[in-house]
């Protein structure tokens, strides 16, 4: 195996390295980065691949364009990873070759058993034939046949032993040798015991009663079995086959030279027979090579499929970890299931039925979905926690962007770990505000304890943060318990969030709280016991009578400062304090991996006492330190909970209730940080090309190691064995059991031609067809020339029909050969009309029709030479029968065609031959001449077989005897067996391609889905940087920011019906319309940051590469302004479809310097900060309904771009004083907007009813001078929540929009009474006075 430094590399890249390396023996090519190939593979459909979907590196350099890949002027390699020795087809790796032989052994064993059964049947039939015909010395012929039958039975039994697996090659050789020595020589017209004597007159040899046709059929069968079944090396098979042919014809030559033929005719006869042997050897070699090519290629493809399956499991695990790190497991699983279903449906939509079928439209059109998918549920008894950093504005005043992001990342990382330990669910951050929930989305009985422990832990964590960072900040925490709506809003950059009036009340609890304490409501206090130090909240005494305090409506509140100490010290606290005394800084100071291991080992040896209910999370490690769960306990944990650590150093999580579920099976290299996941994903992407080019030079044996790893992975997999032993095809028809796969198989050749697929190996469908046509042409020419040569030997002119057939056939063969060469090498150079013709004839039925003609041309050419000489010349008759046997064997060619068609055609040819033997084609005078000639020739022959022959000479069929029927039957039986076996092999090869490609597509889909989720969390260009760095923060000199608020959504929202769920469904539709705008290419430079309640936040100019490509430095501002105008139009269109209510949009626009960065550890959030963001938020909050308000600096730039504004005047902006602002669009009278149109700053009622995270008014801040309130609006503008989910599908502009669909749908909806509203979606909206109209 590989050395430890390379094990990780080999683990992730073994598939591509071991399967895609070139087979050149003089060089080593290793592909480490498979992204480009996988991206191309991901575009393929489920079954829409050809049988040549190989990844081998071969071929020449093509021209640009899609057809350039097809420009390959040299022969491809035999198969992927093939050695350079074509005469011995093997892998270039010993490991792969041995594994291939081992994994293909079941198929080889099964085929050898079939061959033994066939040979035994032949021996039995020949034995019966000799026994039935009463002749002298029958035992001379029956004993060898019966003996070999016993040998076949013995070998058949031997195949079931373990010894056969080690010696099956030698067993095949022995079988063939015994068959050749015991059968074929005995059937020759001479024997070793009776040789010729030198006499003045040649003596007649001993006749064995077997004609030339019978013996030649045996020769053909031996050679076919040698090349196709015995599984010997090609060079050895060729040597044995040629030796056998020479011995066979030598024996026949010695007999013929002494009897019927004389002079030069014997040599012409020998030359003709040599041509026939050339044909059978050519066919055998072709079948041998293609069988080896498909067998090894199938092995490699199935191995790739297994490796891709392993990669698929790893990718799926990585994907789940990435998504679970940013949203609750139950929501993430639902989204992943939805994504998997969409991916599977996409695969089914692109399944490879024929192109004609793909164009068919269903008879029943599905009704389009009017509303977008809406994932939201109502959950009761949920505790909500809001926490704000007191003093954050002062702390960030003198910090750079990078330093500020680092501080927030450190602090929020601690909070993220606290969420995991206290079983809370982090929702988001709003500026320096952090909020989470407990009991949602999975209910918990101890939700209130979880939030209280979370709040106390945050206070302790920030104290430790101040000690380490030398800062002066504190935490103000508020908790409330009630009912929430949880789910996802929008289709782009969405996230898991919670909404309800209780959520807003929890935010109010935080605003009215006290730094260093947890401010809880009376509803939360009901779920707590007396373990905490609790005091009255005294809100009125602290803030006085104000609008903010009035929102409590007399709600009693409490302040919690910590737990009551019932005992001086408990064992749990002692252990915790000892760990805290050691110091987290000392843990971080471990300089090496050994020290880290020692530290971890020391922690494990510390005895962890059982946690008591009174122990809370008092000390929190920094975000980059991982400790055992036993070191941090919380009051919501069961005291008998098992604290065993999960693999990888992570503690198991509880999901439901108080008991911990079984630990999840995690990867050995799992991380808790999404930073590390992104970096891990980047490492899996591969090494750079420059490094991969140096790898072959530095590590010569890397391919051997990866091959060994490849073999180890597939060794224990049952798929390989089941694949070869139980192929997924019908045993009768040989069709695939999957109908879609069968249709794909039938169209694969045509699709390969249509898409100009590159030819890389002999297994390519088009190149395999070229070899088939070339072999057919060769056999046709040899048989035709031999038949014409035979006419010269008998001194008779060839028949005119033979000449006509030869001319027509040779034209067809040459035309087919030219077309095949065009398809393989020059397809991109043909004209459009020619290419359409090629695509037409490459279909399933046209290809079978043309293939049937081509494969039958040799037989047709031989039959065209059947004349009266067939009955008047016994040697001519024998030769023509032998030529027909070769034509029958030719039907083993064209393995891509149906074996049933080829075998039936071969059977027809055999039947026609027998009919011609027994039906006279000549007049009676010719028959009389035949009788006279045969009487003269046979009178001198004395043999046991013909000694009793009657005086009147019989027909050639009578002379040949019934053995021709048996010979043709046995040969046809072998052809049927080989055709079936080769088609199964060909289909298995195609299926291996399909499986490997399907797994590759799934893996790519698995990789794309996390990428899509990451893009919904953070922009793609930011994710790329996070793969190589631990943090991201960047300053932008001129970024554009907008805040768009639906100012009257609070008037529309009510919780009396389904808790307000249907109101948020309407909001989801409107936000979805905004997201659709961002899907347009024109707005690609705009990034959606987040949604805060009914406020939509977006920015532009954050991608520096896009800004550099722009012709104008402020071009992105114009794009953002156009987007804001489109948002106004979308709201107007949406209102036109609403009844009884019109939404009003208010937009604030500003540009300037800002900072973008990513904060968090387990849950990353992409956000923007800066004074520019604060002013953009103020432009919204003090803006005017249905208008866009901009600052003076932004006005100067936009006015130069042709936009007309109204000067509003000087307005007071919190934190900035008096500012000049401008409004768009311009009023008709060019006057200032009347005072009654000005929007008042949002009061706390708007905050509670409509938007989460709104800051208190300026008056409240003045009423509480002792409390340093952070401006939530500023923080809401300073920070952005990234959304984590799958991207919404882009819609074409020509398609009707959701608003138009809702409009059409609304025409059929009548207004009904709210009390009679049903469960239907339209009735629910009608109850809320939200309907659809024109």
From Swiss-Prot:
Residues 1272-1284, 1292-1303 have a biased composition (Basic and acidic residues). It is a multi-pass membrane protein. Gene3D superfamilies: Nucleotide cyclase. The chain crosses the membrane at residues 114-134, 138-158, 168-187, 208-227, 234-250, 270-290, 769-789, 801-821, 850-870, 874-894, 903-923, 958-978. Its cofactor is Mg(2+); Mn(2+). Residues 57-69 have a biased composition (Gly residues). The keyword Endoplasmic reticulum does not apply. Pfam families: Guanylate_cyc. GO terms for cellular component: membrane; plasma membrane. It is an enzyme of class 4 (lyase). Mg(2+) 2 binds at residues 388-389, 432. Insensitive to calcium/calmodulin, forskolin and somatostatin. Stimulated by beta-adrenergic receptor activation. Activity is down-regulated by calcium/calcineurin. Residues 1-28, 49-71, 338-363, 635-670, 1266-1303 are annotated as: Disordered. PROSITE patterns: GUANYLATE_CYCLASE_1 (PS00452), GUANYLATE_CYCLASE_2 (PS50125). Binds 2 magnesium ions per subunit. Is also active with manganese (in vitro). Detected in embryonic heart (at protein level). One of its GO terms (molecular function) is adenylate cyclase activity. PANTHER family: ADENYLATE CYCLASE TYPE 1, ADENYLATE CYCLASE TYPE 9. This is Adenylate cyclase type 9. It comes from Gallus gallus (Chicken). The lineage of its organism: Eukaryota, Metazoa, Chordata, Craniata, Vertebrata.
